[in-house]
Amino acid sequence: GDVSDLSVGLTTATGRPTSVITGVVRPVPLEYSWSMKPDHEAIEELVADQKAPVYIVHPSQKQAVERAQSMTSMKLVSTEERHAIAAEIAGFRFAKGFGSTVRKFITAGIGIHHAGMLPKYRRLIETLAQQGKLKVICGTDTLGVGINVPIRTVMFTSLTKFDGRRTRVLKSREFHQIAGRAGRAGFDT
C-alpha cells in the first residue's frame, strides 16, 4: 500500500530522512502498519484476529524476557492448546533458573528467542513455533536470520539495535530481513 504518509510522519517525528523501498517481489506480500496502541492491547488484538504467531522484536535480550514475563497473565492460548503444549514438552528437561522461566513462558503460549539462550531452548522454541503451538515469540533479531519458522506478524518494539558498540537505527536491509519472517512461502500462503 501507500506508505508516503508514514514516511513523512517518521521524518517529521525523528528529524531524519526516511527511505521508501518499492518494487520488492515476494511470494507472500507483506502488509505494513504503524500503531500507537499499547503493546498488550495490540498483541491481544492480533491474536484475536488470527494474526498469530506474532514475533515481537526487541532491541535487547533483557527487554525480550521482560516482555514475555509481562504477557504471562494474558490468555493467549485456550485450555486445550495449553494441554497440547504440556504434552509436547512433557519429556523435555528444563534446567533450574532460566529453564523454569522458559517453561513458564511456553505453557502460556509464549516463546523467547535470543542469542544468549542455550541452543536446546532455542531449538525447542523453533520446533513449537513450526508446530503452531506458540502465539507469541519475544526475541531479538536472532529469529530473523536463517530460520524458517511460520510467523504471521512481526511487531517491532523499536527500530534500533545494539551493534556491539552502540545503539543505532536499523538499516533498511536489516528491517526487511526481520520483517520478512512474516508470510513465508509454504507456511503462510
Show where each model-derived region lies:
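Beta-edge loop/turn motif
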Residues: P59, R122-E126, Q130-S158, G180
